[in-house]
Amino acid sequence: MQTRSTRNTKKMVGIAILGAMSFILINFSFPIVPGVSFLKVDFSDMPSIIGMFLYGPVGGIAIAFIRSLLHYVQTGGDAGFPIGDLTSFVASVSYLLPLYWVVRKKGTSLNNLILGSVAGTLTLTAVLSVLNYYVVAPLYMWVLNFDVGPMMQYVLYGVLPFNLAKGFLISVVFIVLFGKLKPWLLRNGLYKLNTAK
């Protein structure tokens, strides 16, 4: 039987490995909305999602933080400011927590995975739309002199459809991946999930 110290060590190692995997994945990104090609999708949230179901929400958040921190160290941020990396971290948390809450409470059936994914996508879209309007876009305009045009149009026709599409793509990959890994996640997760249909 594993001691608490051994379990904690394995948890920290697992989070570190998944954080490194997430950092690798963030470097492979692509645009999806015409006109805002600087907004790009990547699948670096997948290790965070896996980690969340293995180690709980704090584990998933820690993995997202490690990814964003390593990416900031690698790139130096935006003129030295971690605007994009902090935004990426907030986006991950906004998607992860509603997804985890729904699946943990309601169960791991396909319908509940879809429900959790929809909750995560809508939360992600709402949070990032507000954050871009009031904080992120103004910061980019101030730091990089980057003009996005009329703010409301940028959010409505750029940020909002981008995050809806991003949430959809991440959700599809998550549902497929969870279906493949479900027995292993249920067996090895530190937090027991409701397996009811």
Q: Could you say what each language-model-derived stretch is?
A:
Residues 1-197:
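Loop-helix junctions at membrane interfaces
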